[in-house]
């Protein structure tokens, strides 16, 4: 299935689940959508936190298409599920933004680690959340983001359990792709990130960690949602964690070496 066909299936309600494992050669994007009045501060926030918030594209005010991301793409309908935040609280999840869209909304598309999972799988590195049919586990850490204007919050990480040799290879592979979070930020003891229980992720689903495996943590594009909550905007919108926008950008084009 091409990215365009995948977006059509989402647009027409045929697909509503997590997007990991779909359209493997193509990049997926996290979303943050917020009023133009605070868009400059949010752009500075992304620039100050590039590991967690690598930008793939930014829309014009009111535009629900971002040409850099793909053709026949509609931000309002082409994501399986959206989170709506009001005054810093998650108030609803919706399957379309058509009724909520405003002329002052600015779209930020942020790289997603699902994008490099195809390369990991090609190298024979297992992805437990895909194997178990679950959403990838994501955790809010105790690490503060670098603040920009009203935006702060804490770093969020995704976790994939791996054997040591696979973890080393994963570092080598993902280092080539800083536009989708790049190399892991931590391997091993989750307490060093302020994570108390790997079986209780704040976002996504817990997965099995087998004997001899260690947790490998990547900076995650859900991080901006902690910043949106921290800012307590009257309204802000994001993808539901694990439910991404499929783009026409090839993963190969994002490699830096």
Curated annotation (Swiss-Prot):
InterPro entries: D-Glu_cyclase (IPR009906), Putative_hydro-lyase (IPR038021), UPF0317 (IPR016938). It comes from Burkholderia lata (strain ATCC 17760 / DSM 23089 / LMG 22485 / NCIMB 9086 / R18194 / 383). It is an enzyme of class 4 (lyase). Pfam families: D-Glu_cyclase. Belongs to the D-glutamate cyclase family. It comes from the Bacteria. The keyword Lyase applies. This is Putative hydro-lyase Bcep18194_B2576. Keywords: Lyase. The keyword Lyase applies. Its EC number is 4.2.1.-. HAMAP family: Hydro_lyase (MF_01830).
């Amino acid at each position: 299935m091409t990215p365009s066909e995948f977006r059509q299936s989402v647009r027409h309600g045929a697909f509503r689940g997590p997007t990991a494992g779909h359209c493997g050669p193509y990049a997926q994007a996290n979303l943050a959508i917020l009023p133009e009045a605070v868009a400059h501060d949010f752009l500075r926030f992304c620039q100050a936190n590039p590991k967690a918030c690598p930008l793939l594209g930014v829309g014009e005010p009111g535009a629900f298409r971002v040409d850099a991301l793909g053709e026949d793409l509609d931000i309002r309908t082409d994501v399986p599920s959206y989170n709506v935040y009001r005054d810093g609280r998650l108030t609803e999840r919706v399957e379309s933004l058509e009724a909520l869209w405003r002329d002052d909304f600015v779209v930020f598309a942020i790289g997603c680690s699902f994008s490099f999972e195809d390369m990991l799988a090609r190298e024979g590195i297992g992805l437990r959340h895909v194997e178990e049919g679950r959403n990838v586990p994501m955790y809010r850490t105790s690490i503060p983001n670098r603040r920009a204007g009203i935006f702060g919050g804490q770093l969020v990480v995704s976790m994939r359990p791996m054997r040591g040799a696979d973890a080393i290879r994963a570092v080598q592979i993902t280092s080539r792709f800083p536009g989708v979070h790049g190399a892991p930020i931590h391997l091993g003891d989750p307490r060093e990130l302020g994570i108390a229980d790997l079986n209780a992720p704040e976002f996504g689903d817990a997965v099995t960690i087998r004997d001899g495996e260690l947790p490998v943590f990547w900076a995650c594009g859900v991080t901006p949602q902690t910043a949106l909550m921290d800012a307590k905007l009257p309204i802000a919108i994001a993808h539901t964690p694990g439910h991404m926008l499929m783009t026409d950008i090839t993963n190969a084009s994002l490699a830096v070496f």
